[in-house]
């Protein structure tokens, strides 16, 4: 994979940014705001369209070339001025060379009238790395999905429909790759007959190429030094051009449900709380069912979880999910109290054997230094504050999180109602509603249910066939000492240890595939102390670990929940028996796609199987659930969403034979 690097900026005497790579300005130095508003807001008729949005309506803007974010901020300012209070703006923008946060801040200082919006953008402009990066503003009223990478690699991965296009990027003569028939075909693929487009260039071949892609473009008067600009609308795919084939039926989007926007999320751990938040921010009324007295009482209840990216150098679906999910979670954490609810202290993964050393070398070659970089032993000791036996790979944006704090923050929304002390045991479909029962008691009902209760969702007949498995894990808590306060970062080898939170260090964690007993045991405490010794004998000594009677150690045990391919299970559920019947032909010839709609269990979704990565994957997967439900652009590449889809297991079973 290619390493995304930041834009190289040259600054003129007035403080205006200029691209070093493309030898072009990011915006007009004479009339930047006026030009942006005229070319993109006026030509797409956004004032009227924002004003006329219906109750709960939304408008989706697509952009080629995020640059300094000026177009986004101007669109947000106009939306804030004239859209209904419950309307939403979703802005999707592709950018090959994102500005660093420092350069972005320096550029946006030039526009003081946008400072209210620019400050919010800068506050969330962290962990911007390769792939799909989602940023959320104003309690979900405004969403920004950045596609970081080459436009012709990123746009084909986007699944969604755009209402208005901002065709930007540097001038065609400076950046011809952004003005090709192939790119215009992608814009057409993502458009509908009501989609509009505006661009600053009036070059004849650009107009003709857009027309050939299915748009109808015309020149209109420009502003400032721009005599003319282009505006247009998507009409239809031209004759002789084949439209993009639909998704395979088992991965197609279910028809959006009409009527009451009410949902039930079952399970108030990380997955359930994040799902409730994502839906509530879109205007859904959400009941969050939890069998315990409060959220985050099981695997999400540990005092410290590590924000650690176990990546692949080969761009796998899991690696893409982790990179996008990490950024999304990291931005959510910016709203929590640092030092108590989370800390961006970094994560150091030690080079504990030759195989790990080779893996780390490959990762360091595949990803930018701002995400991860190698440290030799001496540098690792300086970074961590303790003596070590080796160097390792350092993730400067990582750290630790108090998961219950994140869960509680996610459900602080007027649209979310927590129903505690209720254990959902059965789902029944009655009159387009899902009823949730506990023995003879009807707990609640709604047209939509999201199963977020880890492996416990297998108790429902509708999800019983999902191949989820439990893995018991135990952590150990050790009191901070004067000497252990030197630890400055999370350090991992086979286990992990975190800097102290409220006077206690967390270390762990055990993996037990067989035990179902959640009582902390001495054997696992001893195992965790061994992991600590392997990480750093110096830190073990500082923590006086050898002097602590194992039977007096405090800790906590819970079940992780994972799938056979270690990807989470996220998306709409189908009727398993009807699915096997509908697509039985795949068992004979996997290349033949039956023209049969997927037998969805309308309104039933799952967000589970996050394993030990829930902090990183669950919040973004909640956004994926919301996108499925509300027919929004997906927050992940289509291929990654399909890799996480619940239907993947039944599909593999059919192709391999046996329908399992």
UniProtKB/Swiss-Prot annotation:
A Pfam family hit: DAO
Region span, FAD-dependent cmnm(5)s(2)U34 oxidoreductase: 266-660
Its EC number(s): 2.1.1.61, 1.5.-.-
GO CC terms in record: cytoplasm
Region tRNA (mnm(5)s(2)U34)-methyltransferase: start-end pairs: 1-235
InterPro entries noted in UniProt: FAD-dep_OxRdtase, FAD/NAD-bd_sf, MnmC-like_methylTransf, SAM-dependent_MTases_sf, tRNA_MAMT_biosynth_bifunc_MnmC, tRNA_MNMC2, tRNA_S-uridine_synth_MnmC_C
The protein's name in its UniProt record: tRNA 5-methylaminomethyl-2-thiouridine biosynthesis bifunctional protein MnmC
């Amino acid at each position: 994979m290619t390493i995304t690097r930041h834009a190289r900026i040259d600054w003129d005497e007035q403080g205006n940014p200029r691209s070093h790579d493309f030898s072009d300005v990011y915006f007009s130095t004479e009339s930047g705001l006026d030009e942006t508003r005229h070319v993109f807001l006026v030509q797409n008729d956004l004032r009227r369209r924002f004003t006329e949005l219906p109750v709960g309506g939304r408008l989706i803007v697509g952009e080629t070339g995020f640059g300094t974010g000026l177009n986004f901020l101007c669109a947000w300012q106009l939306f804030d001025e004239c859209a209904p209070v419950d309307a939403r703006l979703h802005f999707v923008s592709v950018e090959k060379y994102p500005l660093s946060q420092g350069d972005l801040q320096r550029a946006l200082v030039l526009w003081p009238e946008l400072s209210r919006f620019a400050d919010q953008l800068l506050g969330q402009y962290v962990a911007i790395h390769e792939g799909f990066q989602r940023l959320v503003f104003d309690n979900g009223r405004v969403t920004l999905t950045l596609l970081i990478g080459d436009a012709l690699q990123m746009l084909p991965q986007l699944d969604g429909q755009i209402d208005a296009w901002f065709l930007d990027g540097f001038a065609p003569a400076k950046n011809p790759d952004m003005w090709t028939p192939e790119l215009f075909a992608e814009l057409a693929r993502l458009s509908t007959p009501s989609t509009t487009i505006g661009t600053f260039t009036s070059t004849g071949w650009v107009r003709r190429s857009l027309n050939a892609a299915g748009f109808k473009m015309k020149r209109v008067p420009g502003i400032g030094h721009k005599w003319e600009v282009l505006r247009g609308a998507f009409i239809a795919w031209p004759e002789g051009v084949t439209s993009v084939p639909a998704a395979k039926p088992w991965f197609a989007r279910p028809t959006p449900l009409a009527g009451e926007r009410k949902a039930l999320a079952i399970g108030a751990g990380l997955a359930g709380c994040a799902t409730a938040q994502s839906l509530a921010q879109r205007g859904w009324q959400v009941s969050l069912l939890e069998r315990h007295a409060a959220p985050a009482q099981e695997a999400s209840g540990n005092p410290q979880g590590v924000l650690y990216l176990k990546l692949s150098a080969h761009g796998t679906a899991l690696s893409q999910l982790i990179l996008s999910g990490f950024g999304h979670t990291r931005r959510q954490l910016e709203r929590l109290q640092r030092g108590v609810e989370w800390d961006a202290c970094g994560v150091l993964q030690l080079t504990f054997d030759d195989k790990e050393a080779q893996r780390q070398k490959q990762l360091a070659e595949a990803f930018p230094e701002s995400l991860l970089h190698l440290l030799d032993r001496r540098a690792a000791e300086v970074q961590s504050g303790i003596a070590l036996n080796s160097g390792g790979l350092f993730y400067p944006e990582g750290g630790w999180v108090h998961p219950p704090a994140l869960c509680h923050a996610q459900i602080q929304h007027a649209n979310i109602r927590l129903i505690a002390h209720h254990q959902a045991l059965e789902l029944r479909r009655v009159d387009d509603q899902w009823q949730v029962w506990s023995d003879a008691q009807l707990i609640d009902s709604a047209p939509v249910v999201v199963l977020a209760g880890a492996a416990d969702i297998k108790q429902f007949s509708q999800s019983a066939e999902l191949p989820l498995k439990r893995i018991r894990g135990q952590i150990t808590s050790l009191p901070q000492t004067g000497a252990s306060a030197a630890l400055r970062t999370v350090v991992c080898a086979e286990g992990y240890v975190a800097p102290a939170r409220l006077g206690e260090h967390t270390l762990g964690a055990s993996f037990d595939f067989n035990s179902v007993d959640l009582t902390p045991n001495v054997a696992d405490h001893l195992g965790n102390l061994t992991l600590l010794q392997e990480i750093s004998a110096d830190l073990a000594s500082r923590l006086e670990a050898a002097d602590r009677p194992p039977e007096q150690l405090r800790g906590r045990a819970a079940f992780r929940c994972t799938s056979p391919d270690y990807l989470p299970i996220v998306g709409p559920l189908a009727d398993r028996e009807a699915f096997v019947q509908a697509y039985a032909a795949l068992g004979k010839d996997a290349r033949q796609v039956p023209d049969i709609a997927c037998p969805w269990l309308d309104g039933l979704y799952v967000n589970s199987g996050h394993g030990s990565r829930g902090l990183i994957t669950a919040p973004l997967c909640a956004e994926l659930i919301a996108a499925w439900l509300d027919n929004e652009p997906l927050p992940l590449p289509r291929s990654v969403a399909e890799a996480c889809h619940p239907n993947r297991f039944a599909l593999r079973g059919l192709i391999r034979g046996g329908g399992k």
